[in-house]
């Protein structure tokens, strides 16, 4: 049976940590765990997901929940409550539902204080990992029989009805998703006609019916070239010489968004070396299986710009294609021949590798994310197959695996801190410290231990890095990459805990460390008042014309986001209240400019575009919360009024809200099919309205939403998993498995607090 291990570094000599592995979560298969009742529950969960896989794509993340609840012998002792049609919502009903949710969720806390949860969903995370381990000869060492079985399960369970695989679990079939997962199945041992429900042959049919693998997008062409399934001449240039350009040039990699920089850094190294894996009999078979014409007859030059229409989200401007053609036809032929291959190309490769090693060391070989992790790991192996750099990478591979009832997948890199700070705020809002003091103390400890204590090593500015001391990451401290919203939410939590008795929640964070966090936020704010995610924004917008991907938007440079801005405004408003003497004028200016940015980017219909959640309900929750913290009200701010009107306009008949993920790529509000409600969206909208003072104007919409949340609670106190709720870069969805538990509890807590409910009946909601 699979078991989740917490804060465990194991005995691998090539792994190291900055904080005793607080926040680390790894899955291991325990052959001794053979309890028949537990095994039966796991198998039942798998079958239930399989039979409903076309109706509900995200899993309920049940395996670790079963493990934790069993280990803690949790039993829900608070009776379930329902509010019948025509029945009045009572204080007692809200309190009972809230207590049930809080006690259940407290039992799901890990021993180090964080809340584990899946953070996955893209269908292109696992295949490159399998390809890399196959190439390097470590596939059998890392992927045990149990790993293979669960990985194949995930691929089978998320195959679409037409035989293909999507860009993400909710998406329509794409060439990128289908080719990568097809190759993954074959590398893991499936034959050409193998796989559950004829998965392999159905996948191959989809590929061939849609033009074959030569129409895969550019990232796919790169991986196929690495595997020997395409020729490098079929790829647009990715010259490592970009790293030799003067840093003052607008297109220098140091001015890129960090994820773009970190993806194309190892890609350019592998491209510059034209690295291709050893051609095995299986590779020769795959060449015959995924192309519509014989491999040696493909005109690779003609397929460089070809992209399957199912994959195309961001068509390349003509200017970009002309740039690639120029590099392809003139520059690359010179740089790959003597003497320039010795004078320039080799120097560029060495500098690129220097940056790779620097980034690896400063993230403890987790790297910034899974796409980058695999490419950097492969680059280290290409440089030295027996070197310590590669061995350190192997030691951190388990940090990316996650197992649930739908199988094993690769995570983005983990959302431990993000989920924990939201969880802590939800529990704090419940005002139940007398019942869950130990839980709060452990969460406080985890958050304090997860703060980044130092800047990147050495002369970090020469490596195009920025200050990180005082920040928080998305996952754990070892990851090392500062994030503005994670820093703001971590700061807010520490400030809230500082208001409580230390004998209950532990000692408050020292002021100096709070000041470090404030310094990060002040450093990152843009001239327009907005907050970027990772690094200061300000590079030229026209650089987005050079976006080399076909399936993402706004990835070339850093941008500002309403969510990051709101989180920072809320944190600094609370900080100013508790520490009024520290950099007061700068903090006040930040709050004023941040609020103005939130107002300025509101859409004409009153909505705000959510960049990291689905989508306009998510954006509205953050925007209204940030404006309220800055002193903006329904009466004195037109943006608040428009935002409230937007939310009330899209409230559904059952009192909830439900938004399709299509809102994200379409950039316009799209409701769920059949006007279904989603409890996470409902929670976001409810909290946004509460921030705006809706309880004082007309509480009925709030009562209707609360009734839906109460009546949707499950027998054990949890809430059901519904549609996917996370997103990044407009077009790729992320499954935040903890959201279904966190936000309904948080919303009910805020509802109870804002509505001043009495023990008597408070409302008669509409049916």
UniProtKB/Swiss-Prot annotation:
Its EC number is 5.4.99.49. GO terms for molecular function: beta-amyrin synthase activity; intramolecular transferase activity. InterPro entries: SQ_cyclase_C (IPR032696), SQ_cyclase_N (IPR032697), Squalene_cyclase (IPR018333), Terpenoid_cyclase/PrenylTrfase (IPR008930). Pfam families: SQHop_cyclase_C, SQHop_cyclase_N. It is an enzyme of class 5 (isomerase). PFTB repeats lie at residues 148-189, 640-681. Expressed only in the epidermal cells on both sides of the leaf and not in internal leaf tissues. Keywords: Isomerase, Repeat. Oxidosqualene cyclase that generates glutinol, a triterpenoid product. Glutinol is probably required to coat the leaf exterior as a defense compound against pathogens or herbivores. Belongs to the terpene cyclase/mutase family. This is Glutinol synthase. The lineage of its organism: Eukaryota, Viridiplantae, Streptophyta, Embryophyta, Tracheophyta.
